[in-house]
Each structure stands twice: as structure tokens, then as C-alpha cells.
């Protein structure tokens, strides 16, 4: 079940589906009226559409994708926070409804605090010129890591991406929340950043902090702290800062077991949820932007169909 706000115009609905690549088998079910703003045209509204997306897969019908824990009047009340669920909500509001020590692993790609917005010319496949929400909000990061410490079980791990420029702030925020910084893993990508093309060398890596609450032993053999995974570009890219599924799978593999709950407060295009499904883990997440919320739903539809047929 998915809930999002739009103005009710067919052209706005089509635009949202184009942005997300929502397949034709995901059908809108009903509408309800409250106040809101259309995420496509930006118009202030008196009515809001409550759009349910159903793919015909029994497991996905139980994987709830909705906003702020609400349901239509015809639906029964939902649990406060359910596993195998992505919520259209800001992470802090949502996490405060989660119980203490309720997740086994956290993998997150929060805003890097660098006011990122790509300068690349828009093409038919992407619309990445919109700035990332909360990308200049250090208070959010501090609150987030504090909430992460609260909901994470003892002796478990938290992987958090950050940029080379801001990693000191992220480390300090984590330590202030009582995490132990175990590694600053270097993720080597296949492409360079743009920047000053005449006076600055292209940056080809991002930082992935490995944090522990207590002491979290890893699974399997010991790895080095330089990980090489190709970045995502072209039509396969659904989010301007999208991470490879294989990279997230490595994090999940090293610090969780089958059946564990993996949390991500900044779901983006849903890569953490997709990786969790592939690794036979449960997931909980939040995403604040409606257009990526649609993308998450569609990716989970495809993931269950192609990689987890036992869940159908």
C-alpha cells in the first residue's frame, strides 16, 4: 500500500510514474481528500490523492509502503513501525516511533552536507538538478546518529557513507552519540567527480564509516579498508547518489545474518531494501521525497519477482 500527495491531475500522475518508472501492473486504487501540495507541479491543494499500488504478489501486498504510518479509513490500523516497510516520512519523526534496540544493522547514505546538486545537463532519463533535501543541516545528522544508537541492538554495526570533505564532522557526530569508529572504508568508484577541471584532480572515492555499538565482530574473513565497486551511471541510475547493490550487500553480509532487520533512514532509491531482500534479511526505512518513494516500490516489485520467488 502506498500513500503520496499529488494534485489529482492525470498529467501529474503520469509524470510521477515516469520519474519512478512505475510499471503498468501497479494500479492506483483509491483517493481521499486532505490538504497538501502536489510534488510535480507544486500547486497548493485542498485535496490529496491516496494511491494504493498493488502488484499482485502476496508478499508485496504485505510489504507496506506508505506515509507517516497512516492508512485510508477503509484499512485496519497498522503497527507503529512494521518490518519489511518503507515509510514516506522524515527519518527523525519516524525513528522516534521505533522501540529501543530493535534493529540488527544500519546501513545509511545520509546527506553529505555539501549542498550537492549535479551540474550535468538534464537528459531524458534523469532529473537530478534538484538539490538534495537537508544537505546543509548538520543538526539533522547529529539527531540521526543519536537515534541510530538508540534503536540499534548492542554489539551491532552501523555503516554510514560520507564525503572526504565532511568525514571529520560525521566521525565526531558518531562519537558524540557513543559509537566507536572502527574504520573509514574507502569506496573506490569507476568514475571521477567534476569540480574544477583545470586546478583540481578528479575525486574517485567516497568514505564509508564502520561504527560499532559496543563491539560488533564481522562475519567471515577479514577484509581491507579499500573496496572497489563500479558506480552507477546512465539509465540504470535512479538517484544522483545511488550506491551499487553489491556494495550494500557486502555490508549486510559482514555484519548480519539471515532473518535480521536492516535499517536505513535515508532510503533514496531503495538500494538497502533491495540488498536486504537479496540477502534474506528484513528491512525498515524512511524516505522523505515522494518521487523516490515510487521508485522504491517499483524496485521491490521487480526484486521479489526476479530474486526472491520463494516470497511470492
Question: Which ranges hold each PLM region?
Answer:
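Core catalytic lobe of class I
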Residues: 65, 71-74, 78-294
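Short, conserved SAM-binding/catalytic segment
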Residues: 77-81, 297-311
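Short metal-binding segments enriched for Cys and/or His
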Residues: 12-26, 57-72
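Short, flexible, mixed-charge glycine/proline-rich loop motifs
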Residues: 1, 26-34, 43-48, 66
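Short Cys/His-rich local motifs and their 1-3 flanking residues in nucleic-acid-associated proteins
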Residues: 9-14, 28, 40-43, 52, ...
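BZIP DNA-binding basic region
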Residues: 1-23, 47-52
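Cationic, low-complexity basic patches in intrinsically disordered or flexible, solvent-exposed regions
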Residues: 19, 31-32, 76
Amino acid at each position: 500500500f502506498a500513500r503520496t500527495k499529488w494534485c489529482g491531475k492525470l498529467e501529474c500522475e503520469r509524470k510521477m510514474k515516469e520519474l519512478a518508472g512505475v510499471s503498468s501492473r501497479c494500479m492506483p486504487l483509491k483517493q481521499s481528500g486532505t490538504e497538501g501540495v502536489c510534488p510535480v507541479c507544486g500547486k497548493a491543494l485542498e485535496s490529496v490523492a491516496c494511491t494504493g499500488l498493488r502488484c499482485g504478489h502476496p508478499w508485496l501486498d504485505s510489504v507496506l509502503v506508505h506515509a507517516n504510518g497512516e492508512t485510508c479509513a477503509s484499512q485496519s490500523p497498522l503497527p507503529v513501525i512494521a518490518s519489511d516497510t518503507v515509510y514516506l516520512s522524515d527519518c527523525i519523526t519516524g525513528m522516534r516511533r521505533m522501540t529501543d534496540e530493535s534493529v540488527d544493522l544500519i546501513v545509511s547514505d545520509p546527506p553529505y552536507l555539501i549542498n550537492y546538486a549535479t551540474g550535468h545537463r538534464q537528459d531524458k532519463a534523469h532529473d537530478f538538478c534538484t538539490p538534495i533535501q537537508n544537505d546543509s543541516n548538520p543538526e539533522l545528522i547529529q539527531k540521526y546518529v543519536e537515534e541510530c544508537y538508540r534503536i540499534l541492538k548492542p554489539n551491532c554495526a552501523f555503516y554510514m557513507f560520507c564525503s572526504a570533505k565532511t568525514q571529520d564532522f560525521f566521525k565526531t557526530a558518531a562519537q558524540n552519540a557513543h559509537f566507536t569508529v572502527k574504520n573509514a572504508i574507502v569506496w573506490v568508484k569507476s568514475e571521477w567527480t567534476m569540480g574544477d577541471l583545470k586546478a583540481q584532480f578528479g575525486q574517485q572515492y567516497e568514505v564509508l564509516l564502520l561504527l560499532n555499538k559496543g563491539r560488533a565482530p564481522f562475519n567471515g574473513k577479514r577484509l581491507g579498508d579499500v573496496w572497489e565497486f563500479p558506480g552507477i551511471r546512465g539509465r540504470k541510475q535512479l538517484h544522483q547518489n545511488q550506491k551499487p547493490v553489491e556494495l550494500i550487500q557486502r555490508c549486510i553480509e559482514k555484519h548480519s545474518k539471515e532473518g535480521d532487520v536492516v535499517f536505513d533512514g535515508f532510503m533514496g532509491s531503495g538500494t538497502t531494501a533491495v540488498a536486504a531482500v537479496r540477502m534474506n534479511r528484513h528491512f525498515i526505512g524512511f524516505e522523505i521525497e515522494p518521487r523516490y518513494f515510487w521508485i522504491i516500490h517499483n524496485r521491490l516489485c521487480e526484486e521479489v519477482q526476479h530474486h526472491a520467488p520463494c516470497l511470492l
